[in-house]
Regions:
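Lipid-exposed faces of alpha-helical membrane segments in multi-pass integral membrane proteins
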Residues: 9, 37-44, 62-65, 86-93, ...
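A cytosolic-side transmembrane-helix exit/cap motif
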Residues: 52, 78-84, 101-110
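Extracytosolic (periplasmic/ER-lumenal) interhelical loops and adjacent juxtamembrane/interface segments
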Residues: 104-150
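Interfacial segments of alpha-helical transmembrane regions
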Residues: 66-98
């Protein structure tokens, strides 16, 4: 949900700053399928019977590490992606510190409370580490509506990064066209 909201916020910011949606077509990522693969691994580790397999959390942690490296690789190519890299790195630190699992606040954990852990998630407790970077933020609590989902500070930084990449990409083509017009016009 937060990723969709981030894209929407980025689009609104892009339009508000006179960006154009067709400029998004000029975004060029190297190895975009890596991102799709990491998202597929995340979904499989949470939504399929694989979530009960011990060790699946390590596959997700390796995928997240690959995503951090991928985002860092794009820092000079894609404006704003450093925020995605930063948020993903924060999540990776928490997950690595907790044996491949992201702690979730008990009040936001749902069925996780009865099981203790599912896939790459574990219920936050005194035995989990870096709980202040774990999934303890509920946006429903902030805005008063929406699904009950838990987010980490890293997730929110990633969402801010997605919004920034979207807005800046919408503006990027407009800035290039303006510069070309100034250079190409006779004195």
């Amino acid at each position: 949900m937060v990723w969709v909201a981030a894209i929407a916020l980025g689009l609104l910011a892009g339009f508000a700053t006179r960006g154009r949606i067709d400029n998004l077509a000029h975004l060029h990522f190297r190895w975009p399928w890596l991102v799709v693969g990491v998202l597929a691994v995340r979904a499989a580790a949470l939504l399929t019977p694989l979530r009960g397999v011990d060790g699946v959390q390590y596959v997700y942690a390796v995928g997240l590490a690959a995503l951090v490296v991928w985002a860092l690789w794009h820092v000079k190519r894609v404006a704003g992606i450093w925020l995605v890299a930063t948020g993903s790195a924060l999540n990776l630190v928490v997950i690595a510190t907790n044996g491949g699992r992201m702690p979730v606040a008990p009040e936001l954990a749902g069925s996780l409370v009865q099981r203790g852990h599912i896939g790459q998630y574990v219920v936050m407790a005194s035995a989990t580490h870096l709980n202040w970077l774990a999934d303890w933020i509920s946006l429903r609590g902030l805005v008063g509506w929406g699904p009950l989902e838990a987010y980490s500070p890293g997730d929110l930084i990633v969402a801010l990064g997605i919004a920034a990449v979207t807005a800046l990409a919408m503006r990027a083509g407009a800035a290039a066209e303006t510069q070309a017009g100034i250079v190409g016009d006779p004195p």
